[in-house]
Design a protein with these regions (language model features):
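N-terminal auxiliary segments of SAM/dcSAM-dependent transferases
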Residues: 1-90
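A general structural signal for well-ordered alpha-helical segments in protein cores
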Residues: 7, 36, 67-68, 139, ...
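Short amphipathic alpha-helical interface segments enriched in basic and hydrophobic/aromatic residues
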Residues: 11, 15, 44, 140-141, ...
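Alpha-helix termini
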Residues: 17-24, 115-123, 172, 247
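Short, conserved glycine- and acidic-residue-centered signature motifs
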Residues: 32, 101, 232
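SAM-dependent Rossmann-like transferase core, predominantly class I methyltransferases
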Residues: 54-61, 65-148, 156-163, 181, ...
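S-adenosylmethionine
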Residues: 111-113, 117, 148-150, 154-294
């Protein structure tokens, strides 16, 4: 059996176990083949982004056993693949992850890399805040994208910040990124030129129906109902009360809301944000100016 054949057989096992995009994927992959390729290539120590060059490589019997063990764990525990491998990739950049953080998949990453945010920046842009940083992936990508800017990365979770520290150090950005323990903006100081935020925003009904893989992630980072609401907008309501005070005249807030556009528009009918185009459509990430938030 070669690598491609092993991946195809593994994908068939995942499908037979009932894993689908709606029930098991969506945390780095969207289908059984890609999920199987991730697990197989990682277990064999092969480059995850170059299947074609190794697809005909024979797989030893011992390697088959190792892959079988990993695949069995994925199916039996319903743990996300990233928690099993302790690694996730975002825009081609590797990040350490474990159960202390959600698995990075923010569409803001696309906007950083493809320069979609750049028209709102200027030579006066100096400071960036990544609010609700989680494992620090957006802060790292922002620091890579804008090498002349200082980046603050804030999160309420000390566990998440510990993982973010691993990733900041992994990419040699300790002198560029400052990690801050903060409940929202409470411990953030001064004004920022660009604020990125991928907050908890999942509504109560969606939280109740999450597949096991998503329930394995920290609920604090997913549920937007921490103050008793049900529409997923609790954190965002609090953010909008205070964020303008830490924005300059030309600062913009780039906010991710996942599949919650309908809830967002009902909660904030007076706002007219700019909606970015992403690989998932134009309902995922929005931009607001300070003028809109005062």
């Amino acid at each position: 059996m070669n690598v491609r054949e092993l991946i195809e057989a593994s994908a068939a096992q995942l499908e037979a176990a009932g894993l689908t995009f709606e029930n098991g994927f969506g945390q780095g992959t969207t289908n059984a083949f890609d999920e199987a390729a991730w697990l197989v290539m990682w277990r064999l120590g092969l480059p995850l982004d170059d299947l074609d060059s190794v697809s005909n490589r024979p797989v030893a019997r011992t390697e088959l056993a190792e892959v079988a063990t990993l695949l069995g764990a994925r199916i039996s525990t319903r743990k996300p693949a990233a928690y099993l491998t302790k690694e996730a990739w975002l825009m081609g950049v590797p990040f350490y992850v474990d159960e202390r953080v959600i698995i990075p998949r923010s569409f803001i990453a696309e906007l950083l890399v493809d320069e979609s945010i750049d028209p709102w920046l200027s030579e006066d842009t100096k400071r960036v805040l990544d609010l609700c940083t989680g494992n620090g992936s957006l802060a790292v990508l922002a620091a890579m994208t804008y090498p002349d800017l200082a980046v603050d990365a804030a999160d309420i979770s000390l566990d998440a910040l510990a993982v973010a520290r691993i990733n900041v150090d992994k990419h040699g950005l300790g002198d560029r990124i400052t990690l801050i323990e903060s409940d929202g903006l409470a411990a953030c100081r001064g004004s920022y030129c660009l604020i990125l935020c991928n907050p908890p925003y999942v509504n109560a009904a969606s939280m109740a129906g999450l597949p096991a893989e998503f329930r394995a992630e920290p609920g604090l980072a997913l549920s937007g109902n921490m103050h008793g609401g049900s529409d997923g907008m609790d954190f965002i309501r609090g953010l909008f009360l205070t964020v303008a005070a830490q924005m300059n005249e030309n600062t913009v807030l780039v906010l991710e809301i996942g599949n919650e556009r309908a809830h967002f528009e009902r909660a904030f009918p007076h706002l007219q944000p700019f909606w970015f185009d992403t690989s998932a459509g134009s309902d995922q990430v929005l931009l607001l100016t300070r003028e809109q938030l005062v």
